[in-house]
């Protein structure tokens, strides 16, 4: 019987929590009781000492000081003083010994309760996410894709004309590709969920409970030692008191840690209630495309997607394996240290080892989680690898429907097409091209001439802006804009003329727009005519249009964007690829979740407000913001190479040192520009830099950035969102951010670069990292790092901010190092 086999159910978890609360209350009662005993012994010793002082005047018997009575009394008073000293020493021994150790035990017990609850909640959340939420999401998407595929197939089969049939077939092939790819994701997700379920109920949860039982039993043994030490110190020599103490000692001796929780287990233990494991939902295949449950689809449509998935899973497996080895080494090291300390520690000092025992149990639990992740990735890799090995060097199987379509094409039709490449080959070429760039973006749109664009897309159309704001926008004679009249369904042409704004209502009748004279089918055509002909708007006013005043270039409408696939996820929401409808510019679109509170949405837009003012080749470029409706978007240039950290980890092995020097030089140039603008980034790291297809590095993610006139920003919030391992000591200790603190972060970025994406301060927690740095320690030199670059790193990590180099000096130094390096 044990926690791991009897308390795996939610009821068992509740019972454990109640037990921990009850035991903590008992320990607190013991501590108060012992403290009262110490206080009582001190007071009693003080009273005895006071009695001795009162008789120190040497009152003697009438027969003189040499009489037996006087000598006896003197001996009594002297021994009373000795007794007071003994009792006082006992009180101090109780305070520094059992009472102090009991306080440490209570503190460790509270920490154990907190750690256990956090780990149990984490395990349950991860199980729910992997086993339920992710699977349900995949199933919902699966059903949608099955419906889309079925509908596309029906339209394809019903199409009669060649043109319609080709178009329908193209849509059907696309739907098949999406369905097959998602089917593969669902198969991999189910396999991962099954393994996570297995690890959760076989290893991770039982391991957590076994660790808890081990620590509880160890603490029970320590409590036994504390009570025995207390009784030994407080024991007196009188027979009646000794008899009581023998009974108390016997009671303390009856404590047996290994049997301490048997009664608790008998009362609350139960058979583990393991819920059924997830399986492939075969109802999804009722209208499917001859798909097999639990089997990956490998054909001409999915070959490249399977290859890319295999590569990705293999890379993730390598990282997971490295993590497992690291955690195994940590567990072994802690076991060795604990064994050594146990040999050199008195049994009654075992309470001092509790924190290390808890560290060991936490490390073992972390190892179990890492092994679960490794097994999931291993299983997914084996599924993908076996499928690829079955294919061998041959061609992937054709999709049956498309294969039939090949045979149905008549020779006459082929001749009529003039030897054109078969449709399937064109489609295969199209699909293979999908995977060439880092991200896929929507296809180009057909561009529309400016004059043919609708009114709301015209740069000089400002919408329903207040009339008072018009006077601020129009500054020179002939400046104009078109706006919507407030409170009326009509459009107004506002023009600056003779030093004051003039407002002309655009007349509309018979679907024509005019001021005086000819009418035009649209307002853009009317404005284009007035601007090109330079004729007065009205004969009476003589006003002529010279220059259109554009609306804020950063303002975009949601309709201005064509969203593509999701390419990432940020702190505030998803990130998508996309295009601008106006000119087909590829963009990255950051979205803000609608459920976020207003203050977080304001922080989301903070990045856009910062970037509006900047224009530098090494700073990611802002294109616009969409704030007219939910969700809010920030639109930025699309940097195809992805983030710098992933780039280092995947491409670093083939990069030359000179290339790395060029890339960190780009980062330094961008930060020098920000420094000149009094901008403090506050979150400079490899993960927040982007890489173009030509290996140009750009600074990104300005969500934590601030602009301060004196170049210093004082943060008032806590450290919850602060990247501790990248942040300077003065920022962590006093909330003082400056360009000098960004220089410290740049030193960590240099270290990440030349360690090819390694994590700084591995195996250290955030608190341990702070203590490590405060003691004067710094990161070691990476293997590939030139000596001159490491010296620059050390300058960036000077403890005093004033001793760190500026970004201007860093740029010059990196440029010099790059010129010297061959």
UniProtKB/Swiss-Prot annotation:
Q: What class of enzyme is it?
A: transferase
List of residues binding ATP:
567-575, 590
Q: What is the regulation of this protein's activity?
A: Kinase activity is tightly regulated. Activated in response to signaling from a cell surface receptor. Activation probably requires binding of a substrate via the SH2 domain, plus autophosphorylation at Tyr-713. Present in an inactive form in the absence of activating stimuli.
Where does the UniProt annotation locate this protein? Answer: Cytoplasm, Cytosol; Cytoplasm, Cytoskeleton; Cell membrane; Cytoplasmic vesicle
Phosphothreonine modification, residue list? 421
**What is the membrane topology here?**
Peripheral membrane protein
Per the record, the coiled-coil ranges are 133-165, 320-369
| Name of the featured protein | Tyrosine-protein kinase Fes/Fps
> Which organism was this protein described from?
Mus musculus
- Phylogenetic classification of the source organism: Eukaryota, Metazoa, Chordata, Craniata, Vertebrata
